[in-house]
Every structure is written in C-alpha cells, then in structure tokens.
Amino acid sequence: MVTDIDKQDSPQFISLNILGIGNYSLPNRVTGRELLENDSEIGYASKVDKQGDTSDVVLAMEIDGELSDLATAITHDATIKFVNGSSVEGRSILRHSTAHVMAQAVRDIWPGAKYAIGPATEDGFYYDFELPGGAHFTDADLGRIEKRMREIIKEDQSFAREEYDLAEGAGLFSDQQYKLEIIQAVGENESVVVTGDESAVVNGRNPVVSVYRNMGVHSDFIDLCRGPHVPSTGYLGNFKLLRVAGSYWRGDENRQQLQRIYGTAFESPDALDDYLKRLEEAEKRDHRRLGTELDLFHFPSEIGGGLPVFHPKGALIRTILEDFSRQVHLSSGYLPVWTPHVTKSTLYAKSGHLEWYSDSMYPPMEMEGAEYRMKPMNCPMHILVYSSRSRSYRELPMRLFELGTVYRFERSGVLHGLARVRGLTQDDAHIFCTPDQLPGELESLVGFVLEVLTTFGFDDFEAELSTRPEKFVGDISDWDLATDALASALSAAEIPYRVAEGEGAFYAPKIDIHLTDAIGRRWQVSTLQVDLQMPARFGLSYVGDDNEKHRPYMVHRALFGSVERFMALLIEHYAGAFPLWLSPVQVLVVPVSESHHDYSEEVLLRLKEAGLRSDIYLADEPLGARIRKGKLEKVPYILVVGGEDVDSRTVGVNRRGSSKPQRGVPLEDFVAEAVSVASERGGSEQDRPE
C-alpha cells in the first residue's frame, strides 16, 4: 500500500481559513473530522448528525477547492470549505456513495457479479453490472437489492480510502474484468482521457490507484474510485432504486452488453419524496407518450431509429415554431441562407469536423469519384456564404441564419424520442464581426435568446460557461479573449452561471443556456460559441477602414438547440396543453345535434376566416363523448352549439382548465377574445394543464 506523507516533511503548525467560520492556527495533519468533533472554536459545524436529514450535516470538505473526505489529513496552510448534504457537491457525494452501497448489495446477493462503473448523475446515480450466467435483473430484484442496501446502511460501515500502486491495485480486482481494464488502460497510456472510475488512477511517474473499502459484518467491499465519499453508510438512508435498462461497456455496441440500475438519493426524506412526485408527474408528461396520444409524431421502424415522422398536428406545431423563428430573426437583422443536406467530405476535413467528430457522422458516400457526407454541422457552409466574395467592415456584423437540418449518427442506446434524434433541424445562426463589435454582439445576442425563450412561458434561466478543453486548436490568448467576452455577456444579462472548466468544444469556448420547466427540471436549450479557429482555417477576412485585411470573429448560435428537442420540451412543459398560439387545433366546434350542423359549419367558417385553427365534431357520436374527446386532445376552446345559439348567433364556450362553461356568448365576442389571446403569445396560467 502507498504510505502517507512523512510527518517530518510537514510544518509543526498550519494556518487554516475555514470559510464562514474564521482563521485558525492548528497542529499539522489535522483531519476534517477532527476539526468538526474536537475543536470547540468551530461553532455551528462542530457536530456530525446522523439523523435522516443531512441537509445541514457536513459530509465532506474542500481543501483549496479540491473535494476531499473528512478523514483526509490537512498538512499545509489551506482554505477549507465544509460541504453539507443540501449543496450541489454534497448531493453528488451522497449519490455516488449510494451507488457504491448498491454495488455492494448486488455483489452480496449475486457473489459472481461483475461491476463496471457507477457515477453520480444530475438527478441520481447508476451502476452497470454483468450477472453470472447471463442472468437479468427483474423489478422484484430491485426490492431485494434495496432491502440489502438498508441492511448495509444500518451497519454504518465506514468508507475508508486506500491507495495502491498499479500492480497492487490490479491484484485487488483480479476477478473484476472491467475494473482491471480501467487500471490497465491508464497504466499503459498516461495520456489517456480519464472518465468515470479511470479518474481513480492518478498518472505520473508512480501511478496510484485509489480504492474505497467498506468494512462489512460478513465481508469487505472494495471499489475503484477517486472519491470523496460520506464518512459512513449511515448517512445514506434517503434513496430509491428506479429502473433497469440495458447498456454497453464503454458505450460501444460492439462490447459486452451490461445491465444498468438507475437510482436516486437525497439529503432528506422530504427532498426524496418531492423528487419522486416530480418523477411521477414527468412520466405523465413524457413527450413520447403524449406524441402518440395527441397524434403528433412517431418513429417508423421502416425508416430507422432517431428519425421521426411528424403527423399533421405535430407538423403544424413545428411549422409554427419555424415560422416564429424566421420572423424574429429577420426582424432582428439576420440574413436568411439555405444550404444543401449533402456535401463533399473535404469541406469537413478543412473545418476539422472530420478529424474530431467522424464517429458521430454518417458513413461517406462515393459519387463520381468524390466522397460525400450528410452534413453534421451548418457552420462550414455558412462560412462559404461569407467567403463567396470579399467583405468590407461596413457589412459587419453579418448575421446569417438558417433552419438547417443536420444528421448525426447517435448510438441507439442514447436515442430518446424527439429529445435525442439522428436527423435534427437547428435554428442556426453564425455572426461574423470585428473585434470591437464582439462584446456588443454577444451582449445583445444573450438578451435576444432570453427574450425569445420568455415568449414560450419560461422565466427561470441559468447558464454554463464551458472553457478550453485539454485537446484544442488555436492560441491560448485567443481562447482567453473569447472566454472573457462570453463571461462579460452573461454578467451584463444578469443571468446566473457556473464555469465548466475544460468542457468547451475543440475549437471554441461556449455558453449553454438552461431553463427550468413547469415541474422544476432543467433543460439545456441555446448554445453560443465564440470561434477564433474556423475563420483562420478558411482564411476569412474583411477589409477594414484602413484598407487592410483583417480576420473576423465568428459566433456560432443555436437558439432552440434543435426544433425537435425544443418540441419535446414544450410538450412536457405544457403536458400537451399548449398555449393558444401553439395549439394545432385552437377551437373545436361541437353541435348538440344534427339540426345544429348548418349553423355550426357557419361558426367554423367564421373562425377560420379570423385565422383560428379550428375543427368540428359533427353529431355522429353522443355529445358527451365528443366533448370528452376534445378535452383529451387538450383543445383550448370547445364551442358547444345548441338550438338557442342558432337563433341568437351565440356559442357555448368551454375553456380548457375551467369547469364552468359560459353559455350564450356572442360569436363575434368570442372570435375577438380568441384572436386577442392568440396574438399575445406566451404561456399564461390559463394555458397550464389541469
């Protein structure tokens, strides 16, 4: 085992700045747990409570910004931040620790089980397994696993971190082929990109493998892991296993098929209950189910996975979105362009996409001695529009816009209705500008994005600023300039954001804007990137006021993300009960009997003349059945037409979400109301589902 740092190498006393508490001079090698339990000066954080609610309980700490176990020895002057269960970091630690307990329970029930990786996710955790003899988990097995997990939690087993060299680490996992592969891959290639459990192997001259050991009553459990973890399993009572799904080792369909168990964990029983209620509501709102129930779209097997076919109502919603997008872009100074769906591969070789993204592209096609590809990105073609002739600074900023369909070969395991498809249409814009124009363009662009998204009834936004990754092209100074400009635009818009270090694209830093839907879920929608690399690759220039050539800056931007994904978001946000301006059928006319058909047809004609999307259900079924059908289709207005209405030129108005129909409404009054509501756009409380 790798030994600790020699005590003689450390100073006798260290200076600690404990955030939120104060500055202290303490003996060296003090641990976080000792700080909490033994130092009376550290007030509110001095007790570790093991009750069911860990919202305010310290689970781990940050030492100079690096997350660590409470058992970690602090051997140098440092800034310390304690992490409680209700923080983002605390929840992640709770979930990852619970994933370990789940793997331990599976190993206890199926002693020959192989366990692969088990990370925390935004809403929970998962772990991938291979059961002996090709066995498969059942729903009943989830209950068995949960029962064993609660026994492990009751034992209050400690999470003990241990470090080994590569050979020792491999020996610990001699019967776990997936852990061995992780250790061996990192040991053989020190430049390997580490993900998941690979980050438990610290590269360098003497690579170190970190593991966590749980001391059980009957046996120990060890797992390859970077950590940190909660001090012991007793902190982990608020969890639920959710479902079983298939997965592939390394996400590669040619590798071993595994079984993935999903679960979630929270800091308190109330937080867990709230999440499970939201999950139940999310299932009711699932756009895949509503897409079928509302006759919006489907995915024919004859066409292939990830390639949706839109039915008339779904195509109408899509058309409304696209028409709205065109309108707001044209009125904001964007210039429309159109580019083909297929292009020569050499274009994407020049842009760098072929080198970096070929695995996500459809295979090449050979035609007339040249290789062609379905386009995965619109940007190289927009660059060709810009470079089709010389440009002057007077033409800048040039904002090019296209509703362009692109094709990406997503693996079948990650396809998810309209939210993850292989053929997607982006409301794609590329802005070419001078350096002086960049800050103003970005500031107005962020404002434009938020204004458009607000039109759809969203008002809770946050952003993520992704910075330079480990593998990138271009100069660091250019990256820093672009990153600073994006950060300034977010600050000017007063939108909260976090920095995702190293998660930018290979050619540009980016902003991802997230919004919160009606049941509190976060969705990523708009993306903005400042690109200093592609203009150089394509030799773009403009003639400045000094008559010299200069290189423009280029901004990539997709506002909806994709039309398909944005439709999925809207379907789930509104549970299919779209605001009036987005509803494929805005008004449904229902005559009480055949004798009212003629007037009902007149009503229908008047509605259509007013520009309202309308339909009629004639009296070939009972009245109640037709009204119920309209409600199931979530039509905003159902007009019931009876004998009194024929004589008085009125209608009976049933508004979605209201249990009280309004009788005897003059037809023209209703038309004026509906036209006014439809023109306002947005999503009001009346538009929310019952």
Residue ranges and their predicted role:
Residues 1-114, 122, 128-690:
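NTP/phosphate- and nucleic-acid-binding module
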